[in-house]
UniProtKB/Swiss-Prot annotation:
UniProt xrefs under Gene3D superfamilies: P-loop containing nucleotide triphosphate hydrolases
NCBIfam families: 3a0107s01c2 (TIGR00972)
EC id: 7.3.2.1
Organism: Photorhabdus laumondii subsp. laumondii (strain DSM 15139 / CIP 105565 / TT01)
GO terms for MF: ATP binding; ATP hydrolysis activity; ATPase-coupled phosphate ion transmembrane transporter activity
Reaction(s) catalysed by this chain's protein: phosphate(out) + ATP + H2O = ADP + 2 phosphate(in) + H(+)
Function comment: Part of the ABC transporter complex PstSACB involved in phosphate import. Responsible for energy coupling to the transport system.
GO BP: phosphate ion transmembrane transport
UniProt topology in membrane: Peripheral membrane protein
Any one Gene Ontology cellular component term annotated for this protein: plasma membrane
Protein name: Phosphate import ATP-binding protein PstB
Originating gene: pstB
């Protein structure tokens, strides 16, 4: 295992992270650096800890009981695991998109405006501009500009997922976490999301969990392979997929297990 990125180029630094579901030790001594304005992918078999690791970056685990993290996660040099961390501000700065599209039960416009209203006081014109900006960034504006006040549920599955991405970036986070964002989508919608991910890294640090190794190879700059709660190998994506250093990594990417 190698850390890949030096501190100067890192947005997130993870040091000796351990995570527990009750007494179950789910993440074991994880250390890695997530590069700024790059796409980092976490791969590995089901139950390896990749989604758990992702959710430590905005402390989503605090929504549930009997879960705790130990170690350090530095976001721009500040440890987010301390009790002093404002969780609401953290989640505004570290947005998240889940496996299944989760539009709010409201209009397309209000799906985007909802989070913005929690953190900013904008005029109607400013909010209109922000909604258009977010939908444009998510490659959805041309498809929704004439039906902004229709329900978010009226969109197709792929459009709903892009709406969730637009909602996530509308509050202008610096990091975007994607937890298997294409697993419920058809190949065409998946292709559009992958194109979007590649475009977003110019402005955001993106971390994606995926079961699809081809997707990781297409979309990411760096890839981490995890197994049974441990970080087995972390490298630039081309190197990990073509010349992995660890036999476990090679076995997984060649289909011998997982």
């Amino acid at each position: 295992m190698n850390i890949v990125n030096d501190i100067a180029s890192s947005k997130i630094q993870v040091h000796n992270l351990n995570f527990y579901y009750g007494k179950f030790h789910a993440l074991k001594n994880i250390t890695l650096n997530i590069a700024k304005n790059k796409v980092t992918a976490f791969i590995g078999p089901s139950g390896c800890g990749k989604s758990t690791l992702l959710r430590t970056f905005n402390k989503m685990y605090e929504l549930y009981g009997e879960q705790r993290a130990e170690g350090k996660i530095l976001l721009d040099g500040k440890n987010i695991l301390t009790d002093k961390q404002d969780v609401a501000l953290l989640r505004a700065n570290v947005g998240m998109v889940f496996q299944k599209p989760t539009p709010f039960p409201m209009s397309i416009y209000d799906n985007i405006a909802f989070g913005v209203r929690l953190f900013e006081k904008l005029s109607r014109a400013e909010m209109d501009e922000r909604v258009q900006w977010a939908l444009t960034k998510a490659a959805l504006w041309s498809e929704t500009r004439d039906k902004l006040y229709q329900s978010g549920y009226s969109l197709s599955g792929g459009q709903q997922q892009r709406l969730c991405i637009a909602r996530g970036i509308a509050i202008r986070p610096e990091v975007l976490l994607l937890d298997e964002p294409c697993s419920a989508l058809d190949p065409i919608s998946t292709g559009r999301i992958e194109e979007l991910i590649s475009e977003l890294k110019s402005e955001y640090t993106v971390v994606i969990v995926t079961h699809n190794m081809q997707q990781a190879a297409r979309c990411s700059d760096h890839t981490a392979f995890m197994y049974l709660g441990e970080l087995i190998e972390f490298s630039d994506t081309d190197t990990l997929f073509t010349t992995p250093k660890m036999k476990q990594t090679e076995d997984y990417i060649t289909g011998r297990y997982g």
